[in-house]
């Protein structure tokens, strides 16, 4: 399931992070840090999506919910349970933020703050 996610949402998030680093003329270490950040962020996003599909409402999420379980699809919630999926998403968010290293709010100002906030948003979103 982790590999499948990496080919979908994860690839889009990694591309966005790495292309931004390239356009910003970041060095190899910064590009690697952003790529690793995006890998963790993409997986946390997918887990949050699985959680929303499990416990969200159509009004809140804006799309049909419960369809993965109805289709018998393997999700992070079905594999880890709801609490386990939440714990894994939180751990990935923390890991993503840790991977930023020199991109932290104190070191890189607004850019670092935005990336840290983005990681938090991914696991607290309700749609």
Short names for language-model regions:
Residues 1-127:
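All-alpha prenyltransferase/terpene-synthase fold signal
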């Amino acid at each position: 399931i982790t590999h499948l996610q990496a080919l979908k949402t994860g690839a889009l998030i990694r591309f966005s992070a790495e292309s931004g680093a390239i356009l910003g003329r970041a060095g190899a270490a910064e590009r690697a840090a952003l790529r690793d950040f995006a890998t963790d962020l993409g997986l946390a996003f997918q887990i949050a999506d699985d959680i929303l599909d499990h416990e969200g409402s159509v009004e809140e999420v804006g799309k049909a919910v419960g369809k993965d379980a109805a289709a018998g699809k393997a999700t992070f919630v079905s594999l880890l349970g709801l609490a386990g999926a939440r714990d894994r998403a939180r751990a990935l968010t923390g890991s993503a933020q840790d991977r930023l290293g020199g991109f932290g709010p104190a070191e890189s100002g607004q850019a670092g703050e935005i990336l840290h906030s983005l990681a938090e948003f991914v696991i607290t979103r309700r749609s």
